[in-house]
Amino acid sequence: MTEVYDLEITTNATDFPMEKKYPAGMSLNDLKKKLELVVGTTVDSMRIQLFDGDDQLKGELTDGAKSLKDLGVRDGYRIHAVDVTGGNEDFKDESMVEKYEMSDDTYGKRTDSVRAWKKKMQEEQGSAAPMENESDKLNEEAAKNIMVGNRCEVTVGAQMARRGEVAYVGATKFKEGVWVGVKYDEPVGKNDGSVAGVRYFDCDPKYGGFVRPVDVKVGDFPELSIDEI
């Protein structure tokens, strides 16, 4: 039987950790490829740090050809992926005033920004996924094609695609607009179907999440096998 590790994945691209399963024999380079959409950068611009079960830094993983097991990764460890270009920090550090005051036209011309990376990925993949600043009208139109019980795949920004089942579609009390509640196949969500004391659907903790309709694709999206995760 293939040895599989349960790992916590964190990144400087998001404040929310994810729990993923990876084969012990997977190479570091293959892991980086899996994390490209999560970190928002390419394999060559990614650093990987390893933390043990007590969250103590073990070191940086650099040999891309070696397996996770050979590099000292073990079940329950944490993998922290870092974009060395610092591009995705534009969205996290509120003290970086220059980033927020930069004109949209100037930012759009940058080739090292997260926006440029996402545009490149969309062109390569032929994706029609809307960008982050789509109007409420687009969300309302997208919601018309989403029904409770649909299998779906969720892609928010540069994060890794997540699969699950649509559990709620409609307005919420926590924020205006149309939202889709998703019951994920894995514990990659933020809640149990409730937000601020209001329950919208039922699921286990960390298996639920709410996203905008434009970030949801419905269709034949079965649960991923270990090799596909």
Curated annotation (Swiss-Prot):
Superkingdom as given in the UniProt entry: Eukaryota
Xref: Gene3D superfamilies: CAP Gly-rich-like domain, Phosphatidylinositol 3-kinase Catalytic Subunit, Chain A, domain 1
SMART domains: CAP_GLY
GO molecular function, one term: alpha-tubulin binding
BP-aspect Gene Ontology terms: post-chaperonin tubulin folding pathway; tubulin complex assembly
GO cellular component: cytoplasm; microtubule
Lipid metabolism recorded as keyword: no
Keywords: Chaperone, Cytoplasm, Cytoskeleton, Microtubule
Compartments where located: Cytoplasm; Cytoplasm, Cytoskeleton
Domain CAP-Gly per the UniProt entry, residue ranges: 170-212
Keyword Chaperone in annotation: yes
Pfam families: CAP_GLY, Ubiquitin_2
The protein's role, per its UniProt record: Binds to alpha-tubulin folding intermediates after their interaction with cytosolic chaperonin in the pathway leading from newly synthesized tubulin to properly folded heterodimer.
Family: Belongs to the TBCB family.
Subunit structure: Supercomplex made of cofactors A to E. Cofactors A and D function by capturing and stabilizing tubulin in a quasi-native conformation. Cofactor E binds to the cofactor D-tubulin complex; interaction with cofactor C then causes the release of tubulin polypeptides that are committed to the native state.
Name this polypeptide is given: Tubulin-specific chaperone B
Source organism of this protein record: Caenorhabditis elegans
